[in-house]
Each structure stands twice: as C-alpha cells, then as structure tokens.
C-alpha cells in the first residue's frame, strides 16, 4: 500500500534497529580522529549538484552510517513516495489533495494529470500572464490614477505568501530591475503599515493582495487599510483597479473588493502556501528581478527536482541532508537545527526554512491519525553569519545540547570591499572547524601557560576554556548566489523536508495546528471589544482581556 494510506511504524523496521545498534557503537567516535585516519574523508562525504557543493564530512558518521541510513530510506519506500508526489497522487491524505508545487517549475511540453486533466497548460498560461503584467509595469505602460507609471509594488500577504517571496527578492537584490521597488506587508500590527506607507505615494503604488481564500485575517485587514489609505491620498473607487491586483482562488471576493477579474491570478489547491513562491504568489519576485530571472529561478528548482528523482540516495543531496537530520533527531537527541547563512542577501533564508520545516513536520500523528512513536520535526533557528558568532554561537560551542548546523556561503561576493569577503568565508569555515575540533583541557592549559599564567590560575581558568568539539555541521557552498542556484537551494530544502516526513510517516502538507489559534482569536477579539460578554475558557486569558479593556477605558 502507498505510504500515505498505511504509514509504517518506522521504529519496527530492521534498518531502524540496526541504526540503534550502530549508534551505540559510535559512542566513542571522533570526527578529528576520523579525518586523521582517512585522507579521503572529505572526498567521500561531499558532492556537487545543481550549482551547489555540499560538504557533509564534518558529521558523526562513517561509511557504514551512511549505508544504514540509506537502508532506512529504502525500507520506508522512499523511491515510491517520491514517484507518488511527482505523479500527482493524493499524498496530502488529511486534505485529500495531491502535492504538485514541482509542476510549477516543469518545462513547456510536459504533461501532468490531476483528476484526468493535464494541468501544465494552465501552469504556463499563468506564467505567461505574469510575464505580460511584469512587462507592462517595467515598461511604464501600467499607470496609476494620475497616469504616472508604477514605481512601488507592495505585496500584502502572510506566511507562504510572504516569507518565500521576500527571501527570494532580497536574496536576488543584485538582479533587481530598476524603476520598481518591491515591499512586503505581512503583520497585522498597524506600526508596520504606518512605517511602510509613510514612504509611498498612492498614485504610483500597486498593491498585490495574496490570499488563497481572500479571507486571511491579517491580509484582508491590511488590504482594507491600504484601500482606505489609497482613497485618503486622492485615489478613487473608479480607479482602484489600477492599484490593486490579487493572487487568489476566490475570484468573487476579490472582485467585490474592487479588483478586476483579469487582474486576479489563480492559486491551486495542490500548491501549499509554504511551497508557493514558484506560483503566481511569486509575482513580486518577478516584478523585482524580471521574468527572465524568475524563469531561471524555476529552472534551478527543476534541476534539483531531477537530481532528487534520479540520483542514488547515497549521492542525493536532499536525501542525505534529510537522513542526517533523522540521525541526529532520533538517535542523538538533537531537538533543533541551526541555519547559518554567511551572506547578507540570504539573511531571510532562516525565516523561510522555519515555516517550510516546522509547519510541515511539526506533527505528532501519522498519516492515519495514530500517534507517532518518534520525535519528528526539529526547531529551526539561526541567522546571518558573523553576527551570530557574537551572539548565539557560544551555545553551539559550549552548551549542553547537540545542535547540528548548516553553514551556507558563496565563494564570490557581489560587493567586494577590500578583503572583507575573504574574512567572511574564513569565518564560516573556521566556525564549522571549531565546532568539530573543540579544545581539550590539555590544549587550554598549554595556551594559558604560554600567556604566563601561574599554575593555580591555570587550574581555575582551564575548565572554562575547554570546548567539547565533535559537533556536527554541513557546509553548503555556491560560487555566487544566482536565480538558478537559489532555486536549486530552496528546492533542495523542500525535498529534504518531504523525505523526513516519509521516514516518520507524517503528512508534511497540512497544518491543522495553525487553525486552532485562528478560531480562538475570533472570540478573544469579541471579548476585547465588548461584543461578547461571557468569560473566556480559562482564567489567564480572561485576566489578560480584562487588563486590556481596563487600560483602554482610560
């Protein structure tokens, strides 16, 4: 039976039991000793694909470890699961949907049926619509109510309608097209809208309202605020269609808002929000970098799709990263994973990967609704390069928790300043090296003696300078961030998340946990404004409601 119909108990598989035994045998394993004993370790545990280079040699693994992890992937039926996803089977079982964000990056001429209908012509029709709209705006042909060209585009959306597009448009800022600035409005906090709108002119601003339902609270409230602002700045209802377009599956609601039907770009149920930057949700990306570069982004993701489907698991970048995550999460008690980009333009990749990973694999039941028997998705956290070294890297080096890390770094900078990039690259490599090597008590004492400290002071200070080392990390290197390489990088992490969900037997494509807070939020709001007088379900929430109301009564 398909993995999404009858999920396995992964802990009962022979490969899982073999990994448990192997973990016991690895208790004394030292990465430093492994490198000293094997001059080819780097070559054995590194690979190139799709413009990316992955060094995973600084991990708590041997060739046997990799073989056993690959056996696990085989025993859970990963190859069949990959085929199921790419062919459009209903792998999102709880919502009864296929999962086909990969269709959005397939080339013209490909065929893919959903419910007996080839969806590829519609996919490329929308891509052509994006191309046409972007061309009109970049050429100054799309005019605002005062007949001036559009200079600013504001994407109103939250979650997947914001995090992915923001990541890509900022990561590819060196490819930005002149004449149009792109902005993002996500939070319902009025301060965000205030700060953004203060620097805009309504007559030259275009808003993109991105919401599948056209009913997402934060997005709809911000869209209404933008509409009120537009009217207050001199715009009219009659000309509103020049300043608002939508990406939504709810055409009726978008039209009722004042958006013309021809300016509503569709969304499909088979594309989840956190996987949607490749769709019309990526319209602000195309506006920022141009459609030629947007298509390069899609092409890069497609090359990773091909690699994922065809490469043997022991040479498959997403599969290897996923297996390493399972290895640490389920056999080494790691609860989190750090994403550490050493590139200013990639500073938002951690936020996107937080949603991608934690919303996908933050699950506690199998596809059939029975409880899992393993830990599942980790906490994803981190931040940009050298800044983190002066903040939280201390915990990575000397804390009590094992926290695997991904270092991401380009070889070439877009903006070389003196020898800054050489230092940036050196810092990235030295951090992964320090995590692995650590510092022994003997090394700490020798270091202090060399500084002239007496033995009593050395005895006191040396324990504080000991760094355990033997802490794992991956290093992902790109020659330089480009649309194609970025597409491959993001797609790689998408597939990594999917592989882990297959191993754990969970559904990576629903997010029911998000809904409860939304439902409760409505009644909390009603109590805040006084339209609902009965007490909240618990004393804490009611107490906080009373505090708010007390302050607002003056």
From Swiss-Prot:
Keyword Isomerase attached: yes
One GO cellular component term noted in the UniProt record for this chain: cytosol
- Which EC numbers does the record give? 5.3.1.9
**Its GO biological process terms?**
gluconeogenesis; glucose 6-phosphate metabolic process; glycolytic process
GO molecular function terms listed in the Swiss-Prot or TrEMBL record:
carbohydrate derivative binding; glucose-6-phosphate isomerase activity; monosaccharide binding
List the pathway annotation.
Carbohydrate biosynthesis; gluconeogenesis; Carbohydrate degradation; glycolysis; D-glyceraldehyde 3-phosphate and glycerone phosphate from D-glucose: step 2/4
Catalysed reaction, written as an equation: alpha-D-glucose 6-phosphate = beta-D-fructose 6-phosphate
Looking up Pfam families in the UniProt record yields: PGI
Q: Where in the cell is it found?
A: Cytoplasm
- Top-rank lineage group of the source organism: Bacteria
Group of enzyme by EC:
isomerase
- Where in the sequence is the active site? 359, 390, 518
Task: State the UniProt keywords alphabetically.
Answer: Cytoplasm, Gluconeogenesis, Glycolysis, Isomerase
Asked if the record carries the keyword Membrane, the reply is: no
Q: Gene3D superfamilies annotated for this entry?
A: 1.10.1390.10, Glucose-6-phosphate isomerase like protein, domain 1 (3.40.50.10490)
The entry's function note states: Catalyzes the reversible isomerization of glucose-6-phosphate to fructose-6-phosphate.
Q: PANTHER family, from UniProt?
A: GLUCOSE-6-PHOSPHATE ISOMERASE
**Assigned protein family:** Belongs to the GPI family.
Q: What is this protein called?
A: Glucose-6-phosphate isomerase 1
Tell me what organism the protein belongs to.
Pseudomonas putida (strain ATCC 47054 / DSM 6125 / CFBP 8728 / NCIMB 11950 / KT2440)
